[in-house]
Swiss-Prot record:
Cellular component terms (Gene Ontology): cytoplasm
EC number: 6.3.2.9
NCBIfam families registered for this protein in UniProt: murD
Name of encoding gene: murD
Subcellular location: Cytoplasm
Role summary: Cell wall formation. Catalyzes the addition of glutamate to the nucleotide precursor UDP-N-acetylmuramoyl-L-alanine (UMA).
Gene3D superfamilies: Mur ligase, C-terminal domain (3.90.190.20), Mur-like, catalytic domain (3.40.1190.10), NAD(P)-binding Rossmann-like Domain (3.40.50.720)
Pathway(s) where this gene product acts: Cell wall biogenesis; peptidoglycan biosynthesis
The protein's name: UDP-N-acetylmuramoylalanine--D-glutamate ligase
Source organism: Streptococcus pyogenes serotype M4 (strain MGAS10750)
Length: 452
């Protein structure tokens, strides 16, 4: 970590804790800043604030008092989840207090080069794939960012010989100014988080900030399947490396079932460790990064063939009596489940789906359900899911929980079948989040395996 004097004796307000705010507070304190942390969660319910107070950091909890900004702060570090129309943020902007993001703070002190990955879908899987391939190739890749490891914490241990492989959300990117990765990946761009950004155009603008400071000596990897990529590519100074599953490009591409970089065949799509058309795209982006990083083709192929997915993201859980289980609890919308289904033989597939509907068009799912062996339906959206199943002429059963659904699916399954949890709905009608929903699937698998 670089020891910089930019924040020495500067009064800095950390707005919002969570993992990133806590990490930023500790880093800035180490750099000699005079830190105040403000979090909306009450102090007695806030272990992170309690821990920071024990370290001598000033904490103010329970609300966001606008008058706090009258204390002449020289910087604000804003939690990514707090929007820019928040009264505290608006007041800071009115007072011309510079607002930093936690990832930019990490960038300022990082000795290690950064590979940044953003996009609407596939960020976590691609980030993990890239780190796995780089590490297998003898490099030292450190996961950081939106993947659960705050960048400002990871950077404190990183050295010049490391590489920070950083997952970046639109929330994290919208406020960056100086941030400059050496390699950036945009997996795809879909209309999501519009409640935060206001419009698709503003959402894309936030994602596009990943390349704002890049030069021709840096590399920007874009999804050439999307027309918007061609438009955006004309506006960057970075060297663009495209990837595509639909056409041959001057980068990474799929042709006749083989994944290539330039003219070099790397791996057959059927040899990838995770199924689905979206995972071919993720693998192509990974191949582009790996080749730019000097990783040998055989290492890339070996890693991609053994990659088992990320937890809750089309995760291959295992087999019981030659019946394979996949946990795709992260699929909370129709598009995600459609992509998951693309990797399987429907005639041997039992799909567990349903949950809280957030405006899905279930008719869009009907073509992807055709030929399914069976559906197990659950949750608030059950009646709409049943109508989709009927239109696809797929038989179904109803369950009251993921555990019950998994047990039913296993009773119906035969040797060679696959059981897939890919809900196409949010979890909040039955579970606090998709992780808890997926964990119940994993726990039920463990019980079934123990009884087998």
């Amino acid at each position: 970590m670089k020891v910089i004097s930019n924040f020495q004796n500067k009064k800095i307000l950390i707005l919002g804790l969570a993992k990133s705010g806590e990490a930023a507070a500790k880093l800035l304190t180490k750099l000699g800043a005079l830190v105040t942390v403000n979090d909306s969660k009450p102090f007695d319910q806030n272990p992170a604030a309690q821990a920071l107070l024990e370290e001598g950091i000033k904490v103010i909890c329970g609300s966001h008092p606008v008058e706090l900004l009258d204390e002449n702060f020289e910087y604000m570090v804003k939690n990514p989840g707090i929007p820019y129309d928040n009264p505290m943020v608006k007041r800071a902007l009115a007072k011309e207090i510079p607002i930093l993001t936690e990832v930019e703070l990490a960038y300022f002190v990082s000795e290690a080069p950064i590979i940044g990955i953003t996009g609407s879908n596939g960020k976590t899987t691609t980030t993990t794939m890239i780190a796995d391939v780089l590490n297998a190739g003898g490099q030292s890749a450190l996961l950081s960012g939106n993947i659960g490891y705050p960048a400002s914490k990871v950077v404190q241990k990183a050295i010049a010989g490391d590489t920070l492989v950083m997952e970046l959300s639109s929330f994290q990117l919208v406020g960056v100014n100086a941030f400059r990765p050496h390699i950036a990946v945009i997996t795809n761009l879909m209309p999501t988080h519009l409640d935060y950004h206001g419009s698709f155009e503003d959402y894309v603008a936030a994602k596009w900030m990943i390349q704002a400071q890049m030069t021709e000596s840096d590399y920007l990897i874009l999804n050439a399947n999307q027309e918007i990529s061609a438009t955006l590519a004309k506006t960057t100074k970075a060297t663009v490396i495209p990837f595509s599953t639909q056409k041959v490009v001057d980068g990474a591409y799929l042709n006749d079932g083989i994944l290539y970089f330039k003219e070099q065949a790397i791996i057959a799509a059927t040899d990838l460790g995770v199924p689905g058309s979206h995972n071919i795209e993720n693998a192509l982006a990974t191949i582009a990064v790996a080749k730019l990083s000097g990783i040998a083709d055989d290492i890339i192929a070996q890693c991609l063939s053994h990659f088992g997915g990320v937890k809750h993201r089309l995760q291959r859980v295992g087999q019981i009596k030659d019946i394979t289980f996949y946990n795709d609890s992260k699929s909370t919308n129709i598009l995600a489940t459609q992509k998951a289904l693309s990797g399987f033989d429907n005639s041997r597939l039992i799909l567990i789906a349903g949950g809280l509907d957030r405006g899905n068009e279930f008719d869009d799912l009907v073509p992807d359900l055709l030929g399914l062996k069976q559906m197990i339906i659950l949750g608030e959206s059950a009646e709409r899911m049943k109508r989709a199943a009927n239109k696809a002429e797929v038989s179904y059963l109803e369950a009251r929980s993921v555990a019950e659904a998994t047990e039913l699916a296993f009773k119906l399954a035969q040797t060679g079948d696959t059981i897939l949890l890919s809900p196409a709905n949010a979890s909040w009608d039955m579970y606090p989040n998709f992780e808890v929903r997926g964990d119940e699937f994993l726990a039920t698998f463990d019980c079934l395996r123990g009884d087998a």
